[in-house]
Amino acid sequence: MAENLFLVLSNPLEGQDDAFNAWYDSTHVPEVLDVPGVVAAQRYDLSEIKVPEDEDLPAQLPPPTHRYLVIYELDREPDAVMAEFLKRVMAGTLTLGETLDVSTVSLTGWTPRGKRRVAP
């Protein structure tokens, strides 16, 4: 796995899931993978966690607000990749599509904290 990550949470416009996923997989991910510093991508569908109703929990988890996640692996600092990403969006060479609900997008950059640990 690469050193740094972008995590992007998103939703399609209402009723546009199929078109959104087709665009994301066939157009958007390849465009993002063309950005220097982006070395890999993996998309995820929301898998809602069902909490047993008989548990006495101190608080309930709020419902999720996003249905899709993509994790981009980066081989350089997130700021450098973001600068090129935005440059390409403004130039029109990295598209945001017609089915993406831009108002729901959450993009964050992440750098490791400590060493990676694995279960024994």
Can you annotate each of these PLM segments?
Residues 1-120:
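Macromolecular interaction modules
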